[in-house]
Amino acid sequence: MEAALAVTRLPPNDPRTPALSVVDMHTGGEPLRIVHAGCPEVAGPTLLAKRRYMRQHLDYIRRRLVFEPRGHRDMYGAILVPSELPDAHLGVLFLHNEGYSSMCGHAVLALGRFALDFGLVPAPPKGAREAQVNIHCPCGLVTAFVECEGGRSCGPVRFHSVPAFVLASDLTVDVPGHGKVLVDIAYGGAFYAFVSAEKLGLDVCSAKTRDLVDAASALTGAVKAQFKINHPESEDLGFLYGSILTDGKDAYSEEATTNICVFADEQVDRSPTGSGVTARIALQYHKGLLQLNQTRAFKSSATGSVFTGCAVREAKCGDFKAVIVEVAGQAHYTGTANLTVEDGDPLRDGFLLK
């Protein structure tokens, strides 16, 4: 009897703030913490307005989810919200150690499974092998396709991106400690700077992670200081999210190409980076290195996990020629939790060590 009571007894929680019920997943090693209950209402008529409201009024929720002691500086989170788009099954706000992203491919791959398994989309017809999940991200509507059996997710997920394009190609950037380097900037729902790690004196496959992070951070800072990022359709999307260092193998090959993404406040993506794969496919297509429906494999130098990507059709974003990119990968569940706040805890909203 006492053992049963011990199991069901909950930790104390400040009654002024509800506990956050979360489901934890990972995609290619990159974590995702999904809040499915307990978050206060996120006000705003549009998803981008909700993102601004979250930043201005509810940022303590992000810190509790992502920061220590409940998380860590490389944790990633997702808040599910209603969408104003009639075709969307759900809206999502993406959270990281510095703030709020416009797109996250690894999260979309995980959310596809979550939405199907937790009943956020209509059950697929009997015998269906794939379910469609329309996810409204801050960058726009992204469609996920979830392998399923008996109405439950059972395998890899793929998604079709928003229009992806190249903002600048072979841009000369003076990177502190590395001199002048030719850099590409491409958009896959978020803007990234791309460069072969070799140009920064590193091997992306064997260098220490700390050295890769330092080089990528120097590149990000230099691009931000020397080049203005503008999105053709929305001011909210006009910012550089991070830098992706590659092995330089951009020409089409059946062999996987390796990269590492460093984004936000030196946060290291453990996966190949879904929005980064999207942008890198757009870049390769722009340079004539890839044709429509040619699939490439992208490997994370952090974990060795692999996503695939291909340009499925041409599109436009403002005046930019763009492509819709299909990205595929495997997400896994890792646990559930109730994140509580005890009254009087001086570290209730979290902290980060660097």
UniProtKB/Swiss-Prot annotation:
Enzyme type, top EC level: lyase
EC annotation from Swiss-Prot or TrEMBL: 4.2.1.77
Classification via SUPFAM superfamilies: Diaminopimelate epimerase-like
Gene Ontology MF term list: hydro-lyase activity; trans-L-3-hydroxyproline dehydratase activity
The reaction(s) this protein catalyses: trans-3-hydroxy-L-proline = 1-pyrroline-2-carboxylate + H2O
Keyword terms, alphabetized: Lyase
Pfam families reported for this sequence: Pro_racemase
InterPro entries per the UniProt record, alphabetical: Pro_racemase_fam
Keyword Lipid biosynthesis set for record: no
Binding site for substrate: G105, H106, D269, G274, S275
Residues annotated as catalytic: C104
Family: Belongs to the proline racemase family.
Protein name per Swiss-Prot or TrEMBL: Trans-L-3-hydroxyproline dehydratase
Originating species: Mus musculus
Lineage summary: Eukaryota, Metazoa, Chordata, Craniata, Vertebrata
